[in-house]
């Protein structure tokens, strides 16, 4: 593999496209190279006669995995202002650049209620901090729910896991810092991966055992200690693509990518588990199973792995998106295949590829469309990865009328089907749902609508669990029983009488600021006729229009089936064939169905195989027409009419919408007056199912012409609709072709072998094929692309007469075939020779491995259950059947409904080949895995070449063997047809029961509806009676109350005043007298009091204070107003004028000064220039004179110095020799004497130490010379032998010698080393001798004592034995030292040392 520096840019770009299958036609070379040439059906269906529905019509090339986009002309710009209520649902997006303005009701401070379309159920209460989390706080699977929390006591990070079915809980711990990201491998996987802020990876396998959650650690990779905490860390699992043959998809990809701040790591978990058994494992100990990708300047934000795990896409805050090719097993470094800036260098926060991971079709390329986001997803862009052009731009902005305009901070997630993009705003309590449409052929994708749903709290993180179809009635979801009942009966009343509508159910688990909630959103998608109508012809899976376009499948629909016309039959061919068994995949190896899968019901087959008159007689009655229509429905759609009409059968959400199979059935009408049209739905079957279906019809030589005529008639009708049309995505752009031609030279042998194999299938003579006929690699590539061949070629290859005019309708030959014919120089020769016998075509393949083919047929029949067996089990299925895959169920029915045909072996396509087979330069890992398959394909190709070259004399035996096989097949076919007749009788009875049950259900519904209407009428009558009673009582009360009031008032006026006046007259006289007397007394007292009060000083002061307080405010206001209105403006004007004058004066003065300064500087510069010229000339002369003198002097000095040096060296060498000899003698003599003295001292000290008593007191050695010992000790210290130096000084029992050592060596040098260099006996002796006399050099002794005591080893037995006595002696000396001089500066250190010794001595006392 070449290094990254030597890669051509065009080569790398084309290599990336080859890996991702971006610009590959529908029949890529890799797909056809995987097809074995030993199977007759495979060669016939894949090479000779491609399915016209899958390759001919451009409208049918869209696959069932992704909803396609109708032809919509987008505007340039659009602004969508959301309203915040339920009317902001499915607002159409009709422009390339769209700005979406958030509603004011979505702000956190708004009091608006949540949306009625959102159902919330709390799961757990916990307070999360409101901020933008770059990773996920929650991970969702079908069985478990995991979310990150913090412990209440210590704040450590944990992950809470909840079982969705039993609500059982458990905790996962052991994280460093917070949990940066967590994710399940896929929805059905029990593997949970967590990544904390330190970069530690945890992978658990969760299981529910006896009602308890059991967690098993699979991988635990630990980062080095001290790794910086960083929240920019992400987990990216390799996408999981479900297989068609898998019932339970719990296996997950072993590849996971980790995004750190400065790098990305891709880990192969299987390799890690095989090489390590115990966890955790440090990352430094792992040598294989991972690869590191570096290439971004700032931290990484998002990433994605291709489904085959060979390409990694990374997005960073530096604005770049880069694609890396990775090989985990090899030694090659990852290389950058492509890079670009999608948002002009702004930080990226989103990288989503629009792949359908729910029902991925092998023909649909991965990574076709890409969604990128920047600035916390405030700007989203849709990209085409073939042309790298922006298709649409969405910008989110805050409400401009809001008081607090907080910019949006959006979290985005794409559902598995790539149909809906869900966004949550961290700064607002709202969820957005955007619908996504794609068109693979035209290379277009866009967002078609946006829906706004208000919540009660902002969503910080969320996980999608289910996005499915549902039925809505008055904006509510139907119950399960009514949902099935209304499916078969709603369309009989027409589109205007519908009570239910197609809806979408989105189930999320959302982390709010206050709680974790289960959120369910139900809404009706956009039903614009301009958008929905083209979907029925572009897509091959469920859509939303079944409520308006679905015909009745009950009795009314069957009754109207006999009044069809010729355009109805033509409309059948426009519908795409179901991709699960009708359409042959041309990009990968086709799904090779057995002949049993093409088996039609006995009623239709007998009518075709017997005679044309039998088909005309079948239209004599209405009942026979109805049964014929029902049987043809079963044959074409592979869905039994019982399962389509039975309202009691449980259906998954995907099956509630009309699939093209039902649309095909519903549009099938028959003409009762024409026998050819009556049989055309059954005779159309060979056109839909090429290959084995034709052999199934032609049972004998006498019936070949009948079947051929029916085939010719149907092909004439189907031919204009099945012509191949060029598609924009099927042709390569010039840059792609040029880059591909350079990369294809190494693959010429493979293409040549494939061309030979296809040449045999196309009956090209061997003489036309030469090794040098392949002119270019592009021609060979075009040969491997699918070339649609129509019905006449099918007839010619099978030995059937296609009728006149069929030979003109054939596809254009490929470039290689044209080159071959030009080299042979036979312009009159035909590309297709005379059609051989059918036995000649099949003998070479059937003789190769007939027994193996029969065994594979039995395996295929064992895998697919018969329809009657499945119908018996459908009623007993529980609600878990709703989770089953609809495509797998239909494929099973398709294979089983035709399971009684012939015994031609058709091995089933391995569903993983389309994922493992890549471009010619795929990774070595994938090449090793597919080595065996390539070998088998090569062997089959060589066998085919050998069979072409065989002489004709071997063919009679092969023909005889083939005839014997055909006889056996015919015999088996008759038996299977009989069994199929019995099966169809049971199916007809089942259909009748289902129709009766549907009618009874409809009758019950109508009866319940009538009862509800009667009850509502009675209720309305009661309400009307109650209203009348209330109105009558109100009228009576108003009338009586007015009259009664007037009469009472009149009576009171006439009676009450006279009586009151008569009774109050004496009382009034008495009161007047008493009041007069009281007033006179009060008047006198009032006058006296008022006079006193007026003369009081307090009153005057109070009045003055009140007046001052009253006038203070107005006066201040008046002065302030006058000052502000009069004084300040006048002062400002005067100051402004003054400053203006000052400014003008200063400016003028500055200008004059500058002018004078410039003139002065110019004159001074001129004078200096004039004075400098003579000085410079003089200096130049002096320099030249100095140089000449210097040269002369240098020569003279060098000669004299050389002579003097030689003389001095001669004299010095002589004297130096004499002095050196004397010095060497003296030094050697001194060193030898010193060495002898040291040796003597060492021997003496050793002897004395050995003879010393155990009391610990050194034996004095008075005979040693003190100076010699100091010299020896100094030498030991210089050599670093500290222990020996202290030991010698202590052994001499001389305190002065010990002080000499202590003064020479710093205590930090002795005790600063991690292991103390002094042994325990030396430490004890040092402590004892230093403490013997603390009167002199107290500071030095105390410092050494403190360090020595701290370095005593209490576990040493010698230390434990002698420490008590030594410490007691030291304490006594310290006590004496403190008593002698208590105010000494060292008393504090001595007291601290005494306390330390007390703690050491006390435990040792008894």
From Swiss-Prot:
The gene is Edc4. It is found in: Cytoplasm, P-body; Nucleus. This is Enhancer of mRNA-decapping protein 4. Part of a decapping complex consisting of DCP1A, DCP2, EDC3, EDC4 and probably DDX6. Part of a complex consisting of DCP1A, EDC3, EDC4 and DDX6. Part of a complex consisting of DCP1B, EDC3, EDC4 and DDX6. Interacts with DCP2. Interacts with RC3H1. Interacts with NBDY. Interacts with Tex19.1 and, probably, Tex19.2. Interacts with LSM14A. Interacts with DDX6. GO terms for biological process: deadenylation-independent decapping of nuclear-transcribed mRNA. The modification Phosphothreonine is found at residues 731, 826, 879, 906. The lineage of its organism: Eukaryota, Metazoa, Chordata, Craniata, Vertebrata. WD repeats lie at residues 174-214, 230-277, 295-334, 342-393. The modification N6-acetyllysine is found at residue 125. Residues 609-631 have a biased composition (Low complexity). GO terms for cellular component: nucleus; P-body.
